[in-house]
């Protein structure tokens, strides 16, 4: 289902006034007609002047050039900010005894509620177990722990909005809900940020500090940033159980991580091996995720500035190097390479065995062009003879393909690039210690001096860049720890295939199955200081060269010493142990989160009660690297799937469809949308970050373009509602601030509706129980039926977890049913004295039930308004709407009247026709009389029952019925509703044809110009044919209406004034 079009909140109807009872045939509405009489001379002259000015404006617009898009952009006007200024201590209930402010103000509404919710314990499952509507069922979720590397972005806000809506709905239903908060230590990201900050503020590098001193700096930074993230979660209204908050580096998590490592090792699923891996420098460390790698396509020669390198480096080039044939001075094999800096690590040259150019050299030796040592020329079917010269250098220590080839031929790798990105001692003194790209230039220079450089040429290529450091990715050989994933992966794939694990949307199943069918072992070692240090110890002892190191694993050094004593047969006290300095991949601890957050490995009450989790909701980009690993480790370590259902939401993009990125300057901070931010504030935040000056200038310019007037204050509820209005079934979510701003207008509409309702109820109003309320008229019955339908649609949306169904139903009820129809319909009834008892009771039920339906999505606004409603007698009210019962469709089913709704939609069609006629003849203030004529008896009876609402809704005067077959009145505009229904509107005395005809001609000319331009223009590539045709049809229809209106006006000029008007 398409998401709710929040960008356009124009109501289809102005409103509907109430019709008391069923009028007799030919009966009319009794409202006054102040504008139905002929226009006075003074008013006529003023109106003619305004119309002449308007006509001149129209003609100027038609003749002049259209404005550029930039000129049409208007700055948002800041709304009046109302503050809650009643002294209230944090945790005390907000004072709602005073009147509502005249307009919705997010800061006023959102003040004081959250601390009170937390202090009262509404978010704790222990409280929910005591609710009257308690079901005895449990519902548990954990928040995807955000990285402590900074503030939450709009993607986090989407996660919170969806999860909190589901959590609040389950809580109001009566389930015992546990939603666990937490944050992730984010090893690589956090260490990089802190290192950058240390250098920026203190001029200190990490290695100039001890490991302990550096970790103290990280912990201090975490405490500052972690608190900021918690405050953002509170501002978003996340109903988390803060007493159960956890952090992936706290004591409980550390115990769980160590236990998991030990158990996996004992199960034979953890091992240590020397393998090639992708590394980044500054400092060089093992990369853990594919999205830390940006594959940048290069069309040819491209210069890049890299961290730590003094000059720009050229890429997209193929260097040709000659390898002399040993024993033949004039013979050589030319090899093409994009990485001449790895030449010192070459151990062979390979050719295809069937390449006739090199058949005579099979088995021969070549001379290394730099080092001079002999290299074998080997044959391998992996070589592509038609690429380059058909000969390739083999560097097993720095290329995955070369590593496989070297293994096939028994070639030993040579590590020539160190972990800090410099050249190793194996390269010789002349290269050792040089930055690898500085060494490149020196190597090419030496090759040229020796006459072995054969030139370079442009070479399109894809260059892997680290998205964090901006450096080129290197492949290095190192001994590290690996998790065997084949067996666990097969179980994860089988869980989805069997239906034990449900992925939604279901199209993600294909990626899941493909990934697990091709899964390799998982490298969990990271060369960092920040993180869980690996609980593995090297037994330091003398052993013969070539023997493998002896490693032991233990929950503590004492336990590891006992294991080492058993392995070596020596007393543990005599053994020297060195703990592995590396830390575990951040994903390792994150993969344990669903059960470590509940106390595992201890058998805690929370673990027994809330594990497995009821649902995992997260971004689709985390499906494999987080969700997949949670399933693998959860099943292995606990014997059960960590959850049975996974709900995946799309990635948030900007309104242009671009990924939100700091480098693009289009990242939206939820706080800026909630509270608003001027352009100066947005720019100052950029300057306070860690961007380098060149990048800062680009980002600042992009930000000014996207938000030229800053960001308006929209509030938390508007942001949450907007995010939830986008369905999860489609592609990426493209979000614009204007969409959220439109939803703020929707909040204001609800606010004004409750102000009206509270005023209408008065202080002495006593609500009836909902089950005793029965409608006393058609309009009451209609709105209660729509309310019951809304409750049913909301339940369907929550059960299917398609929140766009919920937002659509609520938006339609509050705006189009309640505000635009029923509230207008009930106004004349409420003015009667004495006021009938039915409408106030209906108003109360709409407010009470409507707010409870809304509460999971707009918790602050719903609480603020619901607290001001009078309680129903006979049952103690819930202290908060957050723990009040969610409306059940079953309990409201007796209000459903689908046939009445269908019939009333016919009335709304008449209103649309009347409103179109008013717009065509520009009857802005006049209240023309209306006649309806139908040849169908059913329509006649329907219209007779709704004469007053028809007049009110269409802003017309008296509405009457014209008998079937009767002649059309003279001087009245006519419009068909259908083949059987005609609508007539009085024009005589209300419209001056001499003024209106030129205006219609100007409007027609403008529309004709648009139509001609559209027909002459060649459709752009990708433009939908149906959209173009719809636009053409719309313009042609409008032109037809104008022509018909002009014909009516000319006829009105030719006809003498009617001696009398039809009797209504």
From Swiss-Prot:
Composition bias, Basic and acidic residues = 42-56
Concerning InterPro entries, the annotation shows:
aa-tRNA-synth_I_CS, aa-tRNA-synth_Ia, Anticodon_Ia_Val, M/V/L/I-tRNA-synth_anticd-bd, Rossmann-like_a/b/a_fold, tRNAsynth_Ia_anticodon-bd, Val/Leu/Ile-tRNA-synth_edit, Valyl-tRNA_ligase
Where, per UniProt, does this protein localize?
A: Mitochondrion
Catalyzed reactions per annotation: tRNA(Val) + L-valine + ATP = L-valyl-tRNA(Val) + AMP + diphosphate
- Gene Ontology CC annotations of this record: cytosol; mitochondrion
Q: What class of enzyme is it?
A: ligase
Write out the GO biological process terms. valyl-tRNA aminoacylation
UniProt key word ATP-binding:
yes
Supply the EC number(s): 6.1.1.9
Residue positions binding ATP: 662
- Return the annotated region ranges for Disordered: 25-65
Q: What is its main location?
A: mitochondrion
User: Which protein, by its recorded name, is this?
Assistant: Valine--tRNA ligase, mitochondrial
Source organism per entry reads: Macaca mulatta (Rhesus macaque)
| Encoding gene (name) | VARS2
């Amino acid at each position: 289902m398409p998401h709710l079009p929040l960008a356009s909140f124009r109501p289809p109807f102005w409103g509907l006034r109430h019709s008391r009872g069923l009028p007799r045939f030919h009966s009319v509405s009794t409202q006054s007609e102040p504008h139905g009489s002929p226009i006075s001379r003074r008013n006529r002259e003023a109106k003619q002047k305004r119309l002449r000015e308007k006509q001149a404006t129209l003609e100027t617009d038609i003749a002049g050039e259209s404005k550029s898009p930039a000129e049409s952009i208007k700055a948002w006007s800041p709304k009046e900010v109302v503050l809650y200024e009643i002294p209230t201590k944090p945790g005390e209930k907000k004072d709602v005894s005073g009147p509502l402010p005249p307009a919705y103000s997010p800061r006023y509404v959102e003040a004081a509620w959250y601390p009170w919710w937390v202090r009262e314990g509404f978010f704790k499952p222990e409280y929910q177990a005591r609710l009257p509507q308690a079901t005895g069922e449990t519902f548990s979720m954990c928040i995807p722990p955000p990285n402590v590397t900074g503030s939450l972005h709009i993607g986090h806000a989407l996660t919170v909005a969806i999860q909190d809506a589901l959590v609040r709905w389950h809580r109001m239903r009566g389930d015992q809900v546990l939603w666990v908060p937490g944050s992730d230590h984010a090893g690589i990201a956090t260490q990089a940020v802190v290192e950058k900050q240390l250098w920026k503020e203190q001029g200190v590098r990490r290695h100039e500090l001890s490991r302990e001193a550096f970790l103290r700096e990280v912990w201090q930074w975490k405490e500052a940033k972690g608190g900021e993230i918690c405050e953002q979660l509170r501002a978003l209204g996340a109903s988390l159980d803060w007493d159960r908050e956890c952090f992936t580096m706290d004591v409980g998590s550390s115990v769980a991580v160590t236990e998991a490592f030990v158990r996996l090792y004992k199960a034979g699923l953890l091992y240590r091996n020397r393998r090639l891996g992708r590394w980044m420098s500054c400092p060089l460390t093992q990369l853990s995720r594919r999205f830390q790698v940006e594959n940048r396509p290069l069309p040819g020669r491209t210069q890049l500035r890299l961290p730590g390198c003094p000059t720009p480096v050229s890429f997209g080039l193929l260097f040709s190097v000659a390898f002399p044939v040993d024993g033949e001075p004039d013979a050589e094999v030319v090899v093409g390479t994009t990485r001449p800096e790895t030449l010192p690590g070459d151990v062979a040259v390979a050719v295809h065995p069937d390449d006739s150019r090199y058949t005579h050299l099979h088995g021969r030796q070549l001379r290394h062009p730099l080092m001079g040592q002999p290299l074998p020329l080997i044959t391998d079917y992996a070589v592509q003879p038609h690429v380059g010269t058909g000969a390739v250098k083999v560097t097993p220590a720095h290329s995955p393909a070369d590593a496989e080839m070297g293994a096939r031929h028994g070639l030993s790798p040579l590590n020539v690039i160190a972990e800090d990105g410099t050249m190793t001692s194996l390269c010789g003194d002349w290269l050792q210690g040089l930055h690898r790209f500085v060494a490149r230039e020196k190597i090419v220079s030496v090759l040229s001096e020796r006459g072995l450089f054969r030139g370079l040429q442009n070479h399109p290529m894809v260059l892997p860049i680290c998205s964090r450091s901006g450096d080129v990715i290197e492949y290095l050989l190192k001994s590290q720890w690996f998790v065997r994933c084949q067996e666990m992966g097969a179980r994860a794939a089988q869980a989805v295939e069997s239906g034990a694990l449900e992925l939604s949307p279901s199209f993600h199943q294909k990626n899941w199955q493909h990934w697990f069918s091709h899964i390799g072992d998982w490298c969990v070692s990271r060369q960092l200081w920040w993180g869980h240090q690996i609980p593995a110890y090297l037994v330091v002892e003398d052993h013969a060269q070539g023997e493998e190191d002896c490693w032991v694993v233990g929950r503590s050094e004492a336990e590891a010493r006992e294991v080492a004593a058993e392995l070596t047969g020596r007393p543990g006290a005599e053994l020297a142990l060195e703990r592995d300095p590396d830390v575990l991949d951040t994903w390792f601890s994150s993969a344990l989160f669903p059960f470590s957050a509940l106390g595992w490995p201890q058998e805690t009450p929370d673990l027994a009660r809330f594990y497995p989790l009821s649902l995992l909701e997260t971004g689709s980009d985390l499906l494999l690297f987080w969700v997949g690993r949670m399933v693998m480790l959860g099943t292995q370590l606990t014997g059960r799937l960590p959850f049975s259902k996974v709900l995946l939401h799309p990635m948030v993009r900007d309104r242009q469809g671009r990924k939100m990125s700091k480098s693009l300057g289009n990242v939206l901070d939820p706080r800026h949308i909630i509270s608003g931010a001027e352009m100066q504030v947005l720019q100052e935040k950029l300057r306070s970050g860690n961007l380098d000056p060149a990048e800062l200038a680009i980002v600042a310019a992009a930000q000014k373009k996207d938000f030229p007037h800053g960001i308006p204050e929209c509030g938390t509820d508007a942001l949450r509602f907007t995010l939830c209005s986008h369905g999860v079934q489609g592609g990426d979510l493209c979000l614009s601030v204007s969409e959220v701003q439109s939803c703020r207008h929707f909040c204001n509409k609800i606010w004004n509706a409750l102000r009206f309702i509270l005023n209408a109820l008065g202080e002495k109003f006593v609500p009836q129980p909902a089950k005793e309320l029965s409608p006393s008229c058609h309009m009451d019955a209609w709105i209660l039926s729509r309310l019951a339908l809304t409750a049913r649609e909301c339940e369907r949306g929550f059960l299917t977890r398609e929140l766009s169904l919920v937002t659509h139903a609520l938006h339609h009820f509050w705006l189009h049913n309640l505000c635009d129809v029923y509230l207008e319909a009930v106004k004349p009834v409420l003015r009667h004295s004495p006021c009938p008892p039915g409408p106030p009771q209906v108003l109360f039920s709409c407010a009470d039930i409507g707010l409870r339906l809304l509460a999971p999505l707009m918790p602050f606004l719903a609480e603020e308004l619901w607290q001001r409603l009078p309680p129903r007698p006979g049952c103690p009210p819930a202290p908060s709407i957050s723990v009040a019962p969610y409306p059940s469709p079953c309990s409201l089913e007796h209000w459903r009247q689908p046939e009445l709704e269908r019939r009333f939609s016919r009335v709304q069609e008449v209103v649309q026709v009347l409103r179109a006629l008013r717009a065509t003849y520009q009857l802005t203030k006049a209240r023309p009389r209306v006649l309806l004529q139908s040849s169908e008896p059913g329509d006649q009876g329907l219209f007779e029952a709704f004469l007053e609402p028809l007049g009110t809704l269409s802003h017309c005067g008296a509405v009457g019925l014209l008998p079937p077959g009767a002649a059309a009145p003279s001087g009245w505009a006519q419009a068909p509703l259908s083949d059987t229904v005609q609508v007539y509107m009085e024009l005589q005395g209300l419209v001056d044809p001499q003024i209106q005809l030129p205006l219609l001609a100007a409007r027609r000319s403008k529309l004709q110009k648009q139509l001609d331009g559209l027909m002459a223009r060649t459709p752009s590539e990708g433009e939908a044919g149906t959209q173009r045709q719809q636009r053409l049809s719309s313009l042609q229809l409008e032109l037809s209406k104008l022509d018909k209106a002009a014909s009516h006006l000319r006829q009105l000029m030719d006809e003498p004034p009617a001696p009398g008007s039809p009797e209504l």
